[in-house]
C-alpha cells in the first residue's frame, strides 16, 4: 500500500486524576481512572486514518496489547507490520493529571516499543511501494536507524521529535 508508514509507539495509557502530582515519598488516592489506547505513534496513525489517509503502522506490542492493534485496524490502519512479541509487555504509561490545573506527569515503560530491530525494518522497507513516506516519533528505540535506512532506500522521512532529547540534534 502506497501511503504513510508510521514507525511508532503503541502504549496502554493508565490515566489517573489526582488533586496534585505525587511527590517523592508520598502516597495519594486518585479521584479518577481510565485506560486508553496511546503512544505518540498510535495516536498519529489513528488521526491519519480518521483524516482519510492511507496509513500502515509499524511497531511492536506484547500479547497484552492486541486490543491496540484491533482498534487501529477498525479505524482502517494497515496493521500487518505490527509485531506481537510474546516475551515482552506492550509499552505503557502511567499518567497523573491534576484535576484543577490539567498539569500532568508521565512515567513511561517502553516495552515492545524498544523491540524494533534493523532486520524487521529491512523487511518493511522491502515491501514498501515507491512513493511511500516514513513518519517517525521519538518513543521507539530505533528512530535514528530508521531515518538512515529510509534515506538509503529513497523514502522521505517526517519526524515528530517528541519526546525531545538531545540525541535528536545528532541525527541525520
Model-derived features: where do they sit?
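N-terminal glycine-/charge-rich "phosphate-binding" loop or analogous flexible N-terminal tail
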Residues: 20-22
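Substrate-binding N-lobe of the ribokinase-like
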Residues: 3-4, 24-92
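Ribokinase/PfkB-type carbohydrate-kinase core domain
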Residues: 1-10, 70-84, 96-172
Amino acid at each position: 500500500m502506497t501511503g504513510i508508514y508510521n514507525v511508532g509507539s503503541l502504549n496502554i495509557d493508565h490515566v489517573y486524576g489526582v488533586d496534585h502530582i505525587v511527590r517523592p515519598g508520598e502516597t495519594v488516592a486518585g479521584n479518577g481512572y481510565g485506560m486508553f489506547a496511546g503512544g505518540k505513534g498510535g495516536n498519529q496513525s489513528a488521526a491519519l486514518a480518521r483524516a482519510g489517509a492511507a496509513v500502515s503502522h509499524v511497531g511492536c506490542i506484547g500479547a497484552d496489547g492486541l486490543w491496540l492493534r484491533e482498534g487501529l485496524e477498525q479505524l482502517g490502519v494497515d496493521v500487518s507490520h505490527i509485531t506481537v512479541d510474546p516475551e515482552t509487555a506492550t509499552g505503557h504509561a502511567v499518567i497523573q493529571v491534576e484535576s484543577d490545573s490539567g498539569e500532568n506527569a508521565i512515567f513511561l515503560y517502553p516495552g515492545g516499543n524498544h523491540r524494533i530491530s534493523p532486520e524487521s525494518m529491512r523487511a518493511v522497507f522491502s515491501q514498501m511501494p515507491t512513493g511511500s513516506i516514513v513518519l517517525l516519533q521519538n518513543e521507539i528505540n530505533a528512530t535514528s536507524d530508521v531515518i538512515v535506512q529510509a534515506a538509503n532506500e529513497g523514502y522521505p522521512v517526517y519526524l515528530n521529535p517528541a519526546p525531545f532529547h538531545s540525541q535528536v540534534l545528532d541525527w541525520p
